[in-house]
């Protein structure tokens, strides 16, 4: 059986093995079937699944990992700011393997010819269904980290409707956003009405009354555990995108608001607190160092794909890549209210 770390790596690249192409010579040598990829020892009472930054990609794609990823100050030379052979060495990944292809640009062109495209929402759906079947729906939370509706021809032509329809079939439990706001407030409202799950974001306020625009916290019971999910939309939306698209709304990181919502969640009996964030990895590393009683941060925006969660000040930080290539998973074992 696979360990949790191995599963996080293998689930990330399942699409390379079960994609539209038949097994190539390299893939065949890996001797990995979908069933083998999903063999692992589940732990604890709760499974968190994380997908983020799909950017409208319904079908498998070629998406080359970066050759540069600069970290500043204390973040230089540590995940996610590792690329190529340094990344492979740090995570003990074999060169020319499916994991090497999924996570680095090393010999990318040749490996792309061998392994083919990655991703595809149908393949993502298959993996999620199998995990839910193995664990039981009552133990699994599926969370969408945003940048889901925008980035493809079909999402442009349908103004996001294609992605909302597709994601409804996956049945996420909550979502946050960034490029979703670029459809404008009116279209955003229409799409939110079509969604069958909450659009959480505690860091957006209206500029007239300074009141929250969106629901900040959603409570779930999974595996007999009370879980609070706090949403965090991209804090720089009015700067990175045209401000008129979100006129009348104020964004920001607002760490004091996050801490307030964490405290509120704990007072209401949350045994696990999860921040579903589109801040970007380094911003969320900083938050993990300063916020109290936060158990997990599922981060997005920066498209970093890391094959295991990073523990920062007793907060697990997981980044699940982009464009449908990866699914992040964390199993949580909660005892006496502690993870």
Feature map (PLM): residue ranges:
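Acidic, metal/ion-coordinating pockets
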Residues: 2-19, 23-339
